[in-house]
Curated annotation (Swiss-Prot):
Active-site feature positions: 117
Protein name: Nucleoside diphosphate kinase
UniProt enzyme class: transferase
Subunit structure comment from the entry: Homotetramer.
Reported cofactor(s): Mg(2+)
Record EC number: 2.7.4.6
Chain's role: Major role in the synthesis of nucleoside triphosphates other than ATP. The ATP gamma phosphate is transferred to the NDP beta phosphate via a ping-pong mechanism, using a phosphorylated active-site intermediate.
Length: 143
């Protein structure tokens, strides 16, 4: 199977809980290689741009407000079948439906403040990675 890349966000509520290291440890324990990461505080313009596909939906303004409420950690993860495996590790978008042992079951506070984001397809992963990382900012791991 081919190695894929996926995109991950640790959202403001999870950052505030001081669980970044725990989440990274779970990524690595699940076989992901972290090949790019940074912490930043999104501007309203960045959040609106990143979530543009949801503009006009009832939850959009609340999502933008939440995503700009504190720092986030964005990462690029690499593994076989990375997109699906990462989504499985995150759990259901609605934490009420997330299986025990998933990141959202452990760190989410609500549907909007669900602790984490993961790409839903390879195409989304490529677009989301390019939104936050420029050329040379993702480091392939050969060892």
């Amino acid at each position: 199977m081919a190695i894929e890349r996926t995109f991950s966000i640790i959202k403001p509520n999870a950052v505030a809980k001081n669980v970044i290291g725990s989440i990274f440890a779970r990524f690595e324990a699940a076989g992901f290689r972290i090949v790019g990461t940074r912490m930043l505080h999104l501007t309203v313009e960045q959040a609106r741009g990143f979530y543009a596909e949801h503009d006009g939906k009832p939850f959009f303004d609340g999502l933008v407000e939440f995503m700009t409420s504190g720092p986030i950690v964005v990462s690029v993860l690499e593994s076989e079948n990375a997109v699906q495996r990462h989504r499985d590790l995150l759990g259901a978008t609605n934490p009420a439906n997330a299986l025990a042992g998933t990141l959202r079951a452990d760190y989410a506070d609500s549907f909007t403040e669900n602790g984490t984001h993961g790409s839903d397809s390879l195409e989304s992963a490529q677009r989301e990675i390019a939104f936050f990382f420029g050329e040379g900012e993702v480091c392939p791991r050969t060892r």
